[in-house]
Regions:
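A secondary-structure boundary/capping signal
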Residues: 28, 71-72
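Ser/Thr-centric signal marking residues that sit
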Residues: 41, 69-71, 99
Length: 143
C-alpha cells in the first residue's frame, strides 16, 4: 500500500500563483532537508501521520474542490509523491505541487503544474537550486 507522511490537509482559498482566489485543498507533506532562513512552515519538518493514497483521497473528496495543491515541507523529499500526483490527476483533480527547486522535477506527471520556489541568496539555501529544472518547465508551470 502506497503511503505518505502527512502534516496536514486543509481547505482554503489559494493565495498564490495564477490560481489565486480558487478554493483549493492543500495536502502538506512532512519533511524538508532545507533550512531556509525565512521558512514559514518549520512545523512541517517533523511529525505527521502515515496515510494511504485512498485515505488522503477520501479527505480531499469531502472538500468538493477541483484544485489540489501538494506542498510541504518539501513534497519531493518523499519518494511516493510522484505516484501520488498521478493518482490525483487520475481522479480528475487540477493538481499543482509547490517545490523548493532542490529536487529533479523531470518525473512529475505532465498534467501537474509545478510551482518552483527558487531559493534566493537570502534563504541561505540558494546553492540547492537545480538549474536543470528550468529547461523542462512547461507553460503551465510557474516560478
Amino acid at each position: 500500500m502506497d503511503t505518505l507522511t502527512i502534516n496536514e490537509i486543509f481547505y482554503s482559498i489559494q493565495g498564490e500563483t495564477s490560481r489565486s482566489g480558487f478554493p483549493t485543498t492543500f495536502v502538506r507533506l512532512t519533511g524538508c532537508p532545507l533550512r531556509c532562513s525565512y521558512c514559514d512552515t518549520e512545523y512541517a519538518f517533523k511529525n505527521g501521520s502515515k496515510m494511504s493514497f485512498d485515505e488522503i483521497g477520501s479527505l480531499i473528496k469531502k472538500n468538493n474542490s477541483l484544485y489540489v495543491t501538494v506542498t510541504g515541507g518539501e513534497p519531493l523529499a518523499q519518494k511516493n509523491v510522484i505516484p501520488f500526483l498521478r493518482y490525483l490527476c487520475d481522479m480528475n483533480y487540477s493538481v499543482s505541487i509547490e517545490t523548493s527547486n532542490a529536487y529533479d522535477i523531470s518525473n512529475i506527471d505532465s498534467r501537474v503544474s509545478v510551482i518552483l520556489d527558487v531559493k534566493t541568496p537570502a534563504s541561505l539555501e540558494s546553492d540547492k537550486n537545480m538549474i536543470s529544472n528550468y529547461k523542462i518547465l512547461k507553460p503551465t508551470d510557474e516560478i
